[in-house]
């Protein structure tokens, strides 16, 4: 189930305005198109469709999937959205396909707190890729302890959202236990005083844990690189579905 910050229609409608700097996606476009030469991509956790549309603008065939219907509805209303296949649901609901690349941007990979959900997602993505296809995603490095900066004082912002009026939001950590950070993201619409609460949880898995999960789900980890726009804070993982399945008993 998607968090209210993505699933509530009023919040989804202002998401892009509150998070307007998406220069982080330039890194993904360079990897997906320039480095891997992808012609078909499935964007897992596509949200309001910013990255999917960026890829479509460069001629890529894109499928965007997300469990937050309100966010996908925002994506569907954007200019050029008709070029993209939008799917409501999680990766396990992907239709049969043979994509060149699958992506999880914006730390989508961390929302799978439960190991079972994480494994089923990776296996579903593996099945959606053609042999030789790649999965590209990011995850915050737990040793950077990013959550220590998630306080109301450090994150509060008030944004002019045009006809909607001023919208205020912030992030505040509730707890950190067993690699899982729980935090609140209140949003206030100044025009009518409406306040929406949203509580989210993110899993800060170690690099070793993520690589082991990828391997267990049939991927070959081809590269783990420092995120160029956030050095020392995030890893970008590249994993490939092998061209040929491993022989039984092979190690």
Give, region by region, the residue ranges found by the protein language model.
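Class I SAM-dependent methyltransferase SAM/SAH-binding core
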Residues: 49-93
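A short acidic, Gly/Pro-enriched loop at the edge of an enzyme's catalytic core
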Residues: 94-101
């Amino acid at each position: 189930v998607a968090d209210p910050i993505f699933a509530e229609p009023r919040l989804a409608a202002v998401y892009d305005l509150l998070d307007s700097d998406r220069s982080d996606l330039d890194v993904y476009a360079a990897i997906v198109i320039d480095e891997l030469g992808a012609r078909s991509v499935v964007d897992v956790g596509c949200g309001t469709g910013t990255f999917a549309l960026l890829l479509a603008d460069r001629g890529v065939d894109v499928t965007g999937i997300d469990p937050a219907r309100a966010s996908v509805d925002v994506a569907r209303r954007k200019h050029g959205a008709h070029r993209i296949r939008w799917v409501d649901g999680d990766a396990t609901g992907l239709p049969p396909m043979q994509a060149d690349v699958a992506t999880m941007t914006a730390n989508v990979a961390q929302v799978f707190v439960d190991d079972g959900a994480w494994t089923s997602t990776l296996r579903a993505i593996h099945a959606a890729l053609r042999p030789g296809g790649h999965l590209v995603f990011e995850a915050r490095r737990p040793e950077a302890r990013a959550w220590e900066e998630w306080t109301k004082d450090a994150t509060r912002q008030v944004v002019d959202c045009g006809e909607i009026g001023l919208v205020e939001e912030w992030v505040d950590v509730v707890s950190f236990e067993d690699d899982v950070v729980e935090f609140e993201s209140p949003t206030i619409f100044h025009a009518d005083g409406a306040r929406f609460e949203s509580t989210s949880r993110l899993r800060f898995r170690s690099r070793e844990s993520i690589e082991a999960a990828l391997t267990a789900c049939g991927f070959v980890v081809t590269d783990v690189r420092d995120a160029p726009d956030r050095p020392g804070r995030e890893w970008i993982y590249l994993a490939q579905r092998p061209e040929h399945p491993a022989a039984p008993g092979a190690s």
